């Protein structure tokens, strides 16, 4: 089992999309990259905590590779818009890959470079070491499935 943590705008839609990928065992939405270990949705929405909304994936690397997950990540959001996706604006909606190992860092930077070449150098996606991840409140988990 391996873990991927990805920021790509509001976490509700991407969570559903990732959950349908073969090899993804579990998804969880949360907050990552901020200044504190625990945070609430209300606090994140102030844009003062430096957290991003993220989807955390548990996946089987024998079925789907980290690189394929990152390629899908770039397919399902716009990596050229800074701190926004669709109608949502704020630093919590940034495009960011949170890596957990040197190997993930290398893969992330390689994929970002390839996508950047394809998109004429306009990619704003960052890669950062996983820091201060905490799960989002229960009502956010599988939110769109509950509606």
From Swiss-Prot:
Keywords for this protein = Oxidoreductase
Q: Which cysteines are disulphide-bonded?
A: none
According to its UniProt record, this protein's enzyme class is oxidoreductase
Q: Name one GO molecular function term.
A: L-methionine:thioredoxin-disulfide S-oxidoreductase activity
The organism's superkingdom is given as Bacteria
Q: Does the keyword Lyase apply?
A: no
Record's keyword annotation contains Oxidoreductase: yes
What Enzyme Commission number does this protein have? 1.8.4.11
Q: Which InterPro entries does the entry link to?
A: Met_Sox_Rdtase_MsrA_dom, Met_Sox_Rdtase_MsrA_sf
**Catalysed transformations (reactions):** L-methionyl-[protein] + [thioredoxin]-disulfide + H2O = L-methionyl-(S)-S-oxide-[protein] + [thioredoxin]-dithiol; [thioredoxin]-disulfide + L-methionine + H2O = L-methionine (S)-S-oxide + [thioredoxin]-dithiol
Q: Where is the active site?
A: 10
Q: Name one GO biological process term.
A: protein modification process
The protein's job, in short, is: Has an important function as a repair enzyme for proteins that have been inactivated by oxidation. Catalyzes the reversible oxidation-reduction of methionine sulfoxide in proteins to methionine.
Q: Which family does it belong to?
A: Belongs to the MsrA Met sulfoxide reductase family.
Q: What is the recorded name of this protein?
A: Peptide methionine sulfoxide reductase MsrA
